[in-house]
C-alpha cells in the first residue's frame, strides 16, 4: 500500500461511515481530529479489529482527540434521498458537529460531500489514515450499539448478530414477520417483503 502523504496543514479531520449496506437503521458517520501530542496506538480499519479492541479504542479516541463528532441519516432520509446522498448528508453533519473547525477533511472512499473547507477522498483511508481509522471505529461502535438496542425491541430479527445486513437469516425473518418501522423501505429486499416491488 502506498503511504499516504498528508496535506500541509495542522487541523486534519478524518471522516468515515458505517451502515450503507444494511436493510435497517441509520447510516452513521464520524469525524475526528486527532491530537498529535496524544497518539493512539493500534488504530486500524474498524472491520479488522475485534469488538473488545474497538470498544477500548473508542473510549481512548473520545478521551484523546482534539474534537470528535457523530453524524447520521435516518432510514426515512435514506429512502427519500437514496443511500449515497444520505451518506454524504450524514458526513456533512459529522463535520459540522466538530467543536473545532478542521482546516482540511479526509474522507474514506472515492467521493467527498460538499464541505466549507478543502477535502479529499482517500481510497482505503480507514487502513491508511489514522484520523479516518478513528472515525471508522467511533461510527462502528455507535451503530453496533444501536443494533444491539434494536435487537432487544425486535428479538426475532437477530439484529445484534447481523447488524441489519441482508443475511439469509435476516431475509428469512423479514419474509416471516414483515418490516419494522426501522427498515429502509427503498431497499429491494424490504420492498419485496412489503409487497411494494414492481
Curated annotation (Swiss-Prot):
Keyword Ribonucleoprotein assigned: no
PROSITE patterns linked to this entry: RNASE_H_2
Location of this chain's protein in the cell: Cytoplasm
First-listed, main subcellular location of the protein, grouped into a coarse class: cytoplasm
Keyword annotations of the record: Cytoplasm, Endonuclease, Hydrolase, Manganese, Metal-binding, Nuclease
Cofactor note: Manganese or magnesium. Binds 1 divalent metal ion per monomer in the absence of substrate. May bind a second metal ion after substrate binding.
CDD domains: RNase_HII_bacteria_HII_like
Gene Ontology CC: cytoplasm; ribonuclease H2 complex
Tagged with keyword Flavoprotein: no
Cofactor names: Mn(2+); Mg(2+)
Domain annotation RNase H type-2: ranges: 10-198
Positions that bind a divalent metal cation: 16-17, 108
Listed GO biological process terms: DNA replication, removal of RNA primer; mismatch repair
Molecular function terms, GO-annotated: manganese ion binding; RNA binding; RNA-DNA hybrid ribonuclease activity
InterPro entries assigned to the protein according to its UniProt record, in alphabetical order: RNase_HII, RNase_HII/HIII, RNase_HII/HIII_dom, RNaseH-like_sf, RNaseH_sf
Catalyzed chemical reaction(s): Endonucleolytic cleavage to 5'-phosphomonoester
Enzyme Commission code(s) on record: 3.1.26.4
Family recorded in the similarity comment: Belongs to the RNase HII family.
Stated role: Endonuclease that specifically degrades the RNA of RNA-DNA hybrids.
Stated name of the protein: Ribonuclease HII
Organism, scientific name: Escherichia coli O6:H1 (strain CFT073 / ATCC 700928 / UPEC)
Amino acid at each position: 500500500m502506498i503511504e499516504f502523504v498528508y496535506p500541509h496543514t495542522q487541523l486534519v479531520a478524518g471522516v468515515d461511515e458505517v451502515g450503507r449496506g444494511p436493510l435497517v437503521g441509520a447510516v452513521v458517520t464520524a469525524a475526528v481530529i486527532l491530537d498529535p501530542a496524544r497518539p493512539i496506538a493500534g488504530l486500524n480499519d474498524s472491520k479488522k479489529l475485534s469488538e473488545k479492541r474497538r470498544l477500548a479504542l473508542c473510549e481512548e479516541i473520545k478521551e484523546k482527540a482534539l474534537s470528535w463528532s457523530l453524524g447520521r441519516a435516518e432510514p426515512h432520509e435514506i429512502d427519500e434521498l437514496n443511500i449515497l446522498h444520505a451518506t454524504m448528508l450524514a458526513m456533512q453533519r459529522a463535520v459540522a458537529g466538530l467543536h473545532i473547525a478542521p482546516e482540511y477533511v479526509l474522507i474514506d472512499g472515492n467521493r467527498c460531500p460538499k464541505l466549507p473547507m478543502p477535502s479529499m477522498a482517500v481510497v482505503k483511508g480507514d487502513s491508511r489514515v489514522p484520523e479516518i481509522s478513528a472515525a471508522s471505529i467511533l461510527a462502528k461502535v455507535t451503530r453496533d450499539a444501536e443494533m444491539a438496542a434494536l435487537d432487544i425491541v425486535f428479538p426475532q430479527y437477530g439484529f445484534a448478530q447481523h447488524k441489519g445486513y441482508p443475511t439469509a437469516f435476516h431475509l428469512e425473518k423479514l419474509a416471516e414477520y414483515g418490516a419494522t418501522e426501522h427498515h429502509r423501505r427503498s431497499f429491494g429486499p424490504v420492498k419485496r417483503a412489503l409487497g411494494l416491488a414492481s
